[in-house]
From Swiss-Prot:
It comes from Mus musculus. Induction: Cell surface expression is increased by Thioglycollate in elicited macrophages. Pfam families: TMEM106, TMEM106_N. The chain crosses the membrane at residues 93-113. This is Transmembrane protein 106A.
Amino acid sequence: MGKAVSQLTSRKDEDKPILPDNPAMASQAANYFSTGSSKPAHSCMPYEKAASSSFVTCPTCQGNGEIPQEQEKQLVALIPYGDQRLKPRRTKLFVFLSVAICLLIFSLTIFFLYPRPIAVRPVGLNSSTVTFEDAHVQLNTTNVLNIFNSNFYPITVTQLTAEVLHQASVVGQVTSSLRLHIGPLASEQMPYEVASRILDENTYKICTWPKIRVHHILLNIQGSLTCSFLSHPQQLPFESFEYVDCRENMSLPHLELPRPA
């Protein structure tokens, strides 16, 4: 009789759970099974929520699983390798567009910042004044330069250097600092004056003898302009030959030439 009672008692003890019932733990176990399964949400193991616990949505089990909020920062969600969230959409398209935009910006930068030629064209003699002193000719000439900027950015003319030659001899020089701004794809006309002193005796006779009808002398004007753009200086040479009436003063206004094509 005693053995039967003890066996009955041991069977009842075996049927009892070792740990007390805990709805929160049951929900965790259900969520664990739902996480490792690739079946739809309705195949997850059912569980009963604890009244005192709040739950948040778990990203596994197609977003239908729930975990206790107090363990939100402790549990790790397992996502299958074939999940669409691990495969970004249109990656190749985004990479192609990024490369294309970078190439376009680079090409436009090179196109607009690539240095283009700056043309300096002597227009000619604008005016001249002549005086005679002690067997020499004092000649002041005003010449005009046309400057064409073919770049897509402004330039600044900072210095002018010019000299006047007569019969291979330097008779006049000028050096001046400037601050002439020329806009993109624009042109400007710049006058400059050079004082020359001719000591040649034959030239003095040509300019002063009244019996000579033509009182023209040939002057060779050579010079250079210093331009600055994008913090880069550049020298632009120019040269012209001018016939000047050394008998009397003259004035020949020159208009700005059209920009060359």
